[in-house]
Amino acid sequence: SIAKTSATHCLQTLYRTERFPVIILRPFLSYGPGQDSSRFLPQIIKGCLSGKEFETSSGEQIRDFCYIDDITDGILKAMKSDNLNGEIINLASGDPISIRTVIEKVKTYIGKGNPKFGKIPYRVGENMSLYADTSRAERLLGWRSKTTIDDGIKKTVDYYRAYDPQ
């Protein structure tokens, strides 16, 4: 996050001093088919598909997941805009959800899985609430995330069932 903040400041300075054309997009927790299998959602999906116990935190963290097709749509809208130089725009669902709820939704859709909540401690300094204000994306791009977390989970689970057998 320090690197992202530094890059943002650098780009904003370039825009202000040199009129360097830049739009800063901040995608929040993108997920979907083909995502690196070491990431959170693929790990949960694989854990549930296996039907075996798997350890997780208590899941109280609040996050803002955004399906990859929606992120891509937001990026394309920003690229086609002529008057957004210097803007910082969050691309997110705007629907905060707990990690525990996401895990339960995956488990319910798959029909099996045995998460052991509270077995993994939170990371030191973990941000317990991380979600986006999407009002600038709506106002400046006319963009909103279209895919619900339920639909996104289903599409992602279906991908892993078909293309990433255990």
Report residues per predicted region:
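Active-site Tyr-X1-5-Lys
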Residues: 1-23, 49
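C-terminal substrate-binding subdomain of Rossmann-fold SDR/epimerase-dehydratase oxidoreductases
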Residues: 48-166
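Short-chain dehydrogenase/reductase
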Residues: 1-8, 35-42, 64-65, 96
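Helical cap/lid subdomains and adjacent loops of hydrolase enzymes that gate the active-site channel
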Residues: 23, 44-46, 122
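Flexible, glycine-rich beta-alpha linker
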Residues: 23-40
